Swiss-Prot record:
Phenotype caused by lack of the gene: Deletion of the gene results in loss of acid-fast staining, which is a simple and rapid diagnostic test for detecting M.tuberculosis. The region between the inner and outer membranes of the mutant, which is composed mainly of cell wall anchored mycolic acids, shows a significant decrease in electron density as compared to the wild type.
Name used for this protein in its record: 3-oxoacyl-[acyl-carrier-protein] synthase 2
Keyword Acyltransferase part of the UniProt annotation: yes
Species: Mycobacterium tuberculosis (strain ATCC 25618 / H37Rv)
Gene (UniProt): kasB
Keywords: Acyltransferase, Cytoplasm, Fatty acid biosynthesis, Fatty acid metabolism, Lipid biosynthesis, Lipid metabolism, Phosphoprotein, Transferase
Active site per the UniProt annotation: 170, 311, 346
């Protein structure tokens, strides 16, 4: 068996820019402040399709912005929704990172998505049935192809070290960051724009998940209290729109340009359950191994981890499996655990990137927001979940977990800078 590689072999990689839009705010800093203030972005949905199809789920978290007014007419004509989101976020990211001068031959892009623009194809079929082939634009393919969001950013930034689009359900955003880190430490790039974007809340995804009966909360009378990760009485997740991008680069590259360094990204691991299409391995074996490998690749030990940003969607099986995965990997260590989907909802392909930024901010500010709606911790979940009030502390190293349908597991190790 090949000897396992540890972080001692890798160049240091750091986070130097962040951009995010969520159901709470249109930027990362405001989202962060509102999470610390125990605010929720989950509201009653007022979309016409809720009544039209009599959907059993009537709650969710829409973004607080549209992107159209931030783009030119030509851009609007050529871009689908995900490309508009990624383009706007990438421009904010570049500004946040100090508008750096970079060698484009050493710049890569890695942006994941889960559902992508699949619903746009459905809408195009409706137009085609009504008006025939002339209703289909010659720009249709480029507007709705899954890699469009990453490609649009890569073209604007003239990135030539690779453009990637991980599609791994709810782990897509985290996998995009993990793949970017891997390319940098392998020497294939000096810097990467990475993260995840996801489409709007729509009728068909709600109906599809709702028909599974075990994964979505129908607590429509209490939107803000509906998602209850790790609680004994949890009954499923809630959709919450989002998108997030990070700029990561070698520490040497960042220092050379005088960048504002927010945190270290120290290790990342990707595993798979090989168990079931939509259910996690209840023992959390391979999810736990992803955490273990991220720690090893970072050159750390399980006892070094002070904080875990949990995937924790609020489903019965998922939260229990993640609790076991964390315990499998960390043994007797009990880091402070946070479950942000209780406040922001689940943005599918974007959520791993959203929560990576939250992990970075927790390390930067040395405080963890409270998990909302945790009243009675499930007795089968042996975790130290932060609830009630924000918890200041001495947080040196953290893990961000992301898991997805299909058995996808991603764990990323971050460090305080």
């Amino acid at each position: 068996m090949t000897e396992l590689v540890t972080g001692k072999a890798f160049p240091y990689v750091v986070v130097t820019g962040i951009a995010m839009t969520t159901a709470l705010a249109t930027d990362a800093e405001t989202t962060w402040k509102l999470l610390l203030d125990r605010q929720s972005g989950i509201r009653t949905l007022d979309d016409p399709f809720v009544e039209e199809f009599d959907l059993p789920v009537r709650i969710g978290g829409h973004l607080l912005e549209e992107f159209d007014h931030q783009l030119t007419r030509i851009e609007l004509r050529r871009m689908g929704y995900l490309q508009r989101m990624s383009t706007v976020l990438s421009r904010r990211l570049w500004e946040n990172a100090g508008s750096p001068e970079v060698d484009t031959n050493r710049l890569m892009v890695s942006i994941g998505t889960g559902l992508g623009s699949a619903e746009e194809l459905v809408f195009s079929y409706d137009d085609m049935r009504a008006r025939g082939m002339k209703a289909v634009s010659p720009l249709t393919v480029q507007k709705y192809m899954p890699n469009g969001a990453a490609a649009a950013v890569g073209l604007e930034r003239h990135a030539k070290a690779g453009v990637m689009t991980p599609v791994s359900a709810c782990a897509s955003g985290a996998e995009a960051i993990a793949r970017a880190w891997q390319q940098i430490v392998l020497g294939e790039a000096d810097a990467a724009i990475c993260g995840g974007v996801e489409t709007r809340i729509e009728a068909v995804p709600i109906a599809g998940f709702a028909q599974m009966r075990i994964v979505m909360s129908t607590n429509n009378d209490d939107p803000a209290g509906a998602c209850r990760p790790f609680d004994r009485d949890r009954d499923g997740f809630v959709f919450g729109e989002g998108g997030a991008l990070l700029l990561i680069e070698t520490e040497e590259h960042a220092k050379a340009r005088g960048a504002n360094i927010l945190a270290r990204i120290m290790g990342a691991s990707i595993t798979s359950d090989g168990f079931h299409m939509v259910a996690p391995d209840p023992n959390g074996e391979r999810a736990g191994h992803a955490i273990t490998r991220a720690i090893q690749l970072a050159g750390l030990a399980p006892g070094d981890i002070d904080h875990v940003n949990a995937h924790a969607t609020g489903t019965q099986v998922g939260d229990l499996a993640e609790g076991r995965a964390i315990n499998n990997a960390l043994g007797g260590n009990r880091p402070a655990v946070y479950a942000p989907k209780s406040a922001l909802g689940h943005s599918v392909g974007a959520v791993g990137a959203v929560e990576s930024i939250l992990t970075v901010l927790a390390l930067r500010d040395q405080v963890i927001p409270p998990t909302l709606n945790l009243v009675n911790l499930d007795p089968e979940i042996d975790l130290d979940v932060v609830a009630g009030e924000p918890r200041p502390g001495n947080y040196r190293y953290a893990i961000n977990n992301s898991f997805g349908f299909g058995g996808h597991n991603v764990a990323i190790a971050f460090g305080r800078y």
